[in-house]
Amino acid sequence: MKIRSVSHNNRKKAFEVRTSTRTFLLPYAKVSPEPMRDNGIARVFVDPELGREGFTYVLESGKEGTVHIEQVLEYNQDPGFLRDALLYKLTIEAQKRVEASPLAKREIIRRLGTSATQFYRLLDQKNSRKSVDQLLSLLHVLDCDVALVVRAKSA
Protein backbone atom coordinates (compact mmCIF):
# COMPACT_ATOMS: atom_id res chain seq x y z
CA MET A 1 0.00 0.00 0.00
CA LYS A 2 1.42 3.35 -1.04
CA ILE A 3 1.24 6.54 1.02
CA ARG A 4 -0.10 9.52 -0.90
CA SER A 5 0.64 12.17 1.72
CA VAL A 6 1.55 12.57 5.37
CA SER A 7 1.14 15.51 7.73
CA HIS A 8 1.49 16.10 11.43
CA ASN A 9 -1.26 17.42 13.67
CA ASN A 10 0.11 18.82 16.91
CA ARG A 11 -3.37 19.38 18.33
CA LYS A 12 -4.18 15.66 18.00
CA LYS A 13 -0.52 14.75 18.66
CA ALA A 14 -0.62 12.38 15.71
CA PHE A 15 0.55 11.87 12.15
CA GLU A 16 -2.16 11.84 9.49
CA VAL A 17 -1.28 9.29 6.81
CA ARG A 18 -3.35 9.38 3.62
CA THR A 19 -3.47 6.38 1.29
CA SER A 20 -5.58 5.81 -1.81
CA THR A 21 -8.40 4.32 0.27
CA ARG A 22 -8.47 6.28 3.52
CA THR A 23 -6.67 8.42 6.08
CA PHE A 24 -5.09 6.86 9.17
CA LEU A 25 -3.90 8.46 12.39
CA LEU A 26 -0.73 7.36 14.17
CA PRO A 27 -0.10 8.94 17.61
CA TYR A 28 3.29 10.47 18.30
CA ALA A 29 3.59 8.12 21.30
CA LYS A 30 3.84 5.11 18.93
CA VAL A 31 6.99 6.30 17.14
CA SER A 32 10.62 6.57 18.13
CA PRO A 33 12.08 9.14 18.62
CA GLU A 34 8.89 10.62 20.05
CA PRO A 35 8.15 14.25 19.21
CA MET A 36 7.78 16.37 22.36
CA ARG A 37 6.57 19.88 23.06
CA ASP A 38 10.16 21.18 23.37
CA ASN A 39 11.37 19.01 20.45
CA GLY A 40 8.67 19.26 17.81
CA ILE A 41 8.54 18.09 14.23
CA ALA A 42 10.54 20.23 11.82
CA ARG A 43 9.37 18.36 8.71
CA VAL A 44 7.65 15.17 7.63
CA PHE A 45 7.60 13.62 4.15
CA VAL A 46 6.70 10.46 2.26
CA ASP A 47 9.99 8.65 1.78
CA PRO A 48 10.70 7.70 -1.86
CA GLU A 49 13.57 5.44 -0.67
CA LEU A 50 10.92 3.22 0.96
CA GLY A 51 8.95 3.04 -2.27
CA ARG A 52 6.34 5.45 -0.84
CA GLU A 53 5.44 2.72 1.68
CA GLY A 54 6.75 4.73 4.62
CA PHE A 55 7.43 8.24 5.82
CA THR A 56 10.27 10.02 7.57
CA TYR A 57 10.04 12.83 10.07
CA VAL A 58 12.76 15.13 11.35
CA LEU A 59 12.63 16.66 14.82
CA GLU A 60 13.85 20.16 15.64
CA SER A 61 16.87 18.57 17.38
CA GLY A 62 17.85 16.94 14.06
CA LYS A 63 16.90 13.38 15.05
CA GLU A 64 15.09 11.38 12.37
CA GLY A 65 12.49 8.69 12.59
CA THR A 66 11.02 6.44 9.92
CA VAL A 67 7.64 4.73 9.99
CA HIS A 68 6.51 1.97 7.60
CA ILE A 69 2.88 1.74 6.45
CA GLU A 70 2.59 -1.66 8.17
CA GLN A 71 3.09 0.02 11.56
CA VAL A 72 0.24 2.41 10.75
CA LEU A 73 -2.06 -0.39 9.56
CA GLU A 74 -1.27 -2.55 12.59
CA TYR A 75 -1.97 0.29 15.02
CA ASN A 76 -5.28 1.07 13.29
CA GLN A 77 -6.24 -2.63 13.20
CA ASP A 78 -6.94 -2.49 9.47
CA PRO A 79 -9.00 -5.64 8.64
CA GLY A 80 -7.19 -6.26 5.35
CA PHE A 81 -3.80 -6.03 7.02
CA LEU A 82 -4.86 -8.32 9.89
CA ARG A 83 -6.18 -10.90 7.39
CA ASP A 84 -2.93 -10.81 5.43
CA ALA A 85 -0.90 -11.13 8.65
CA LEU A 86 -2.94 -14.18 9.70
CA LEU A 87 -2.52 -15.75 6.24
CA TYR A 88 1.23 -15.11 6.39
CA LYS A 89 1.60 -16.75 9.82
CA LEU A 90 -0.47 -19.77 8.79
CA THR A 91 1.51 -20.11 5.54
CA ILE A 92 4.86 -20.07 7.34
CA GLU A 93 3.58 -22.72 9.76
CA ALA A 94 2.26 -24.83 6.86
CA GLN A 95 5.65 -24.61 5.12
CA LYS A 96 7.40 -25.87 8.26
CA ARG A 97 4.88 -28.69 8.68
CA VAL A 98 5.15 -29.81 5.03
CA GLU A 99 8.95 -30.01 5.34
CA ALA A 100 8.69 -32.00 8.58
CA SER A 101 5.87 -34.26 7.38
CA PRO A 102 6.60 -37.88 6.55
CA LEU A 103 3.93 -37.68 3.82
CA ALA A 104 5.08 -37.17 0.25
CA LYS A 105 3.94 -33.94 -1.36
CA ARG A 106 1.97 -35.92 -3.95
CA GLU A 107 0.08 -37.66 -1.14
CA ILE A 108 -0.69 -34.31 0.52
CA ILE A 109 -1.98 -33.00 -2.83
CA ARG A 110 -4.12 -36.11 -3.30
CA ARG A 111 -5.60 -35.82 0.20
CA LEU A 112 -6.36 -32.14 -0.36
CA GLY A 113 -8.11 -33.01 -3.61
CA THR A 114 -6.36 -30.22 -5.46
CA SER A 115 -3.75 -29.69 -8.14
CA ALA A 116 -0.02 -29.41 -7.60
CA THR A 117 -0.18 -25.80 -8.79
CA GLN A 118 -2.80 -24.91 -6.19
CA PHE A 119 -0.79 -26.69 -3.48
CA TYR A 120 2.31 -24.65 -4.27
CA ARG A 121 0.22 -21.46 -4.32
CA LEU A 122 -0.93 -22.32 -0.80
CA LEU A 123 2.70 -22.57 0.31
CA ASP A 124 3.65 -19.24 -1.31
CA GLN A 125 3.68 -16.59 1.42
CA LYS A 126 3.48 -13.81 -1.18
CA ASN A 127 0.15 -15.10 -2.50
CA SER A 128 -2.58 -13.19 -0.66
CA ARG A 129 -5.44 -14.54 -2.79
CA LYS A 130 -5.74 -17.78 -0.84
CA SER A 131 -8.23 -18.26 1.96
CA VAL A 132 -7.82 -19.15 5.60
CA ASP A 133 -10.11 -22.12 4.87
CA GLN A 134 -7.65 -23.56 2.34
CA LEU A 135 -4.74 -23.24 4.75
CA LEU A 136 -6.73 -24.85 7.56
CA SER A 137 -7.53 -27.76 5.23
CA LEU A 138 -3.83 -28.16 4.45
CA LEU A 139 -2.88 -28.09 8.13
CA HIS A 140 -5.59 -30.67 8.86
CA VAL A 141 -4.16 -32.99 6.18
CA LEU A 142 -0.79 -32.57 7.91
CA ASP A 143 -2.37 -33.83 11.18
CA CYS A 144 -2.30 -30.46 12.93
CA ASP A 145 -4.89 -29.19 15.37
CA VAL A 146 -5.49 -25.49 14.83
CA ALA A 147 -7.20 -23.70 17.71
CA LEU A 148 -8.59 -20.24 17.16
CA VAL A 149 -8.64 -18.30 20.42
CA VAL A 150 -10.84 -15.24 20.77
CA ARG A 151 -10.25 -13.11 23.85
CA ALA A 152 -10.97 -9.60 25.02
CA LYS A 153 -8.37 -7.04 24.07
CA SER A 154 -6.13 -5.99 26.95
CA ALA A 155 -5.86 -2.28 27.63
Give the label of every model feature segment.
Residues 126:
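Catalytic-site neighborhood detector that most strongly recognizes the C-terminal catalytic loop/helix
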Residues 123, 134:
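DNA major-groove recognition helix of helix-turn-helix
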Residues 118-120:
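Short beta-strands and strand-loop turn motifs
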Residues 1-112, 116, 129, 133, ...:
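Motif-centric detector for short Cys/His coordination patterns
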